[in-house]
């Protein structure tokens, strides 16, 4: 299976890429920084936030897309989270409109906010940071 991974050089992305390649998948790695990306993956220099409707084709029409890219993920109150929200949404809409059938978008514990105890898909979201608010808004918009 051909799998595109955005944020492929990031904190989680580099391990996702390695695991997928180890499992025999063809991996298209997308990131602004290529350092740390498994050499067996194909690097794709496409700007996923350009708003171009043909972004799926530029990625090589993968069978699946795992969207991990997120600027300033460790800076929880960065203005970038809200500033870039529409770009994330447009990127994902363009994938769907182009026919991509399998898309996974990484969420975060910051969507839940402060919560003690076990969480599951029914745990209410109460994000407290710009990061959590933006991630939650993207999930709700989709």
Regions from the language model: what does each represent?
Residues 90-130:
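Conserved Rossmann-fold NAD(P)-dependent oxidoreductase catalytic core, especially the SDR/UDP-sugar
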Residues 15-19, 94, 141:
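Rossmann-fold NAD(P)-dependent oxidoreductase module
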Residues 48-85:
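NAD(P)H-binding glycine-rich loop region in Rossmannoid oxidoreductase-like domains
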Residues 6, 30, 65-68, 103-109:
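SDR active-site strand-loop-helix element
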Residues 38-51:
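Rossmann-fold cofactor-recognition segment
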Residues 3-23:
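N-terminal Rossmann NAD(P)H-binding glycine-rich loop of SDR-like oxidoreductase domains
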